[in-house]
């Protein structure tokens, strides 16, 4: 679990439900650690009508994405379940392009790596916009926070 304290409308703690994740390869574990660090360094996360800061546990429950939100003291605020259906295609495509990216780093030219990375960022942006739309009215978050959350959502799908 990662933890950090700052202003009220933010995530101060973020974790992935241990029952929902498999251990990834070293690249994946590194990406997961970076995503947890980055989201705590800078995020905007607000539940309308409820002041934070918040603690978030992401998980998978019956093939749905679970956002278990609590106060930093552990008092439950809400649990929101999202269908994974709108994310399935982008998760599949993102997984393929990440694999291509990691392979390209070892063998491709800088211009080829850059082209793959542009595609990866485009898919990441698409997924973060979908996430913002799916949470609209329940959780307000900025683009960068949505991107970082998608990285963690993607981490829930890594095969061990």
From Swiss-Prot:
Disulfide bonds: none annotated. InterPro entries: UCP032146. Belongs to the UPF0262 family. This is UPF0262 protein Mrad2831_3513.
